[in-house]
């Protein structure tokens, strides 16, 4: 396991980080990432698989799998909804109207800051989802008058 337990304890005691990434290498000779994704899909309606690869490589260097998020964030027409799921499965939800969802997203991300550690990929966790085309209306007011025909949320993370 990387980092060691003592290193994790030291990072946690520094008070600088809301999360500390932990890595364990697993040989993928029994299940492919797609097979693991199918298993996770049965356990949670929210799951994802991200594969990394350099442009000249066929195979990915890392497979990122995630499920059962502790936070869900959506925004439609300025109405931002944040759903928290704690470790004891207690759920809370808050709603607010905003003209600038980016501010709220940055505020949330500060709480989950993690250290950059040697030997780890650039992405060690965080928000996963999408910003739709309609999200541009928050940066460009003239686009607010146009209503998209699709039923996508402006943000779904």
Please describe what each predicted stretch is.
Residues 1-157:
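Signature of the chorismate-utilizing enzyme
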């Amino acid at each position: 396991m990387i980092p060691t337990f003592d290193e994790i304890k030291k990072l946690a005691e520094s008070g600088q980080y809301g999360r500390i990434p932990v890595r364990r290498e697993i040989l993928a000779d029994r299940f492919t990432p797609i097979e693991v994704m199918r298993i996770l899909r049965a356990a949670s309606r929210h799951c994802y698989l991200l594969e990394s690869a350099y442009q000249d490589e066929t195979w990915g260097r890392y497979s990122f799998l995630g499920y059962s998020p502790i936070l869900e964030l959506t925004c439609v027409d300025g109405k931002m909804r944040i759903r928290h799921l704690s470790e004891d499965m207690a759920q809370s939800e808050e709603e607010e109207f905003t003209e600038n969802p980016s501010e709220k997203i940055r505020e949330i991300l500060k709480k989950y800051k993690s250290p950059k550690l040697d030997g780890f990929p650039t992405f060690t966790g965080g928000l996963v989802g999408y910003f739709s085309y309609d999200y541009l209306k928050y940066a460009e007011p003239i686009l607010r008058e146009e209503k998209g025909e699709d039923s996508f949320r402006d943000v779904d993370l």
